[in-house]
Amino acid sequence: MSKPAIYVINARERDRIPHENVPVAAIHAPMGAREMANPKYRKDWGYSFGNEIGRLAQGMPGRVKGTDTLKFISYADMPMDRRRDCTYARIVCNCRPQKSEVNRTRVTVGGNLINCPFDCGTPTTDLITVKILINSVISTPHAKWMTIDIKNMYFMSEMKNAEYMRFPIDLIPPEIMEQYKLQDKIHNGFVFCKIKRGMYGLPQAGLIAQELLAKRLGEHGYYQSKRTPGF
């Protein structure tokens, strides 16, 4: 039996391909903020983007619960010595037909502009260690294996030093503007936020989340090997 054809569809191609001709196995290539601002897609993707901002901030009533990862502030509330470090928001949109929320928007931090004053390398288990563990499981009669995906672990990791990020005002959905009263916070075409917890793209986010995980597991008798990082 032959495998189904797979189409890679980006925002520009989507209107040219009849929906009935696209197989279930279709993969939708991510599109960026510029394409999201296109009037053709703004309504659908604006709603998705609103959910993502609400998830990162203090929520959107009736839609998503916030994680208090970031907080919108006025430009004047940003410390003078941190304004040079203010980075950009990278916005990525993707279609995930297998998910309950098909149109998915994610915001990551422009980490290349972050000045981290400490070594933010994260201890990581190497591939050989993982292979040894898996081989041990499959070689042991009646052994069972379990993996756990921790939701919002990055977003729940407090940072000692806050970071700052900006959003172009023309991409912010109207309901977000109203909910967070952003009209009064516009400065030179941007709104600004204070990042209080870990976010994808922050160079220190992985280390902070790993340290928090080690602390939580330590309360139940688990500890990290001194010879094998991440184990």
Which residue stretches match the model-derived regions?
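Chromodomain-type histone methyl-lysine reader module
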Residues: 1-231
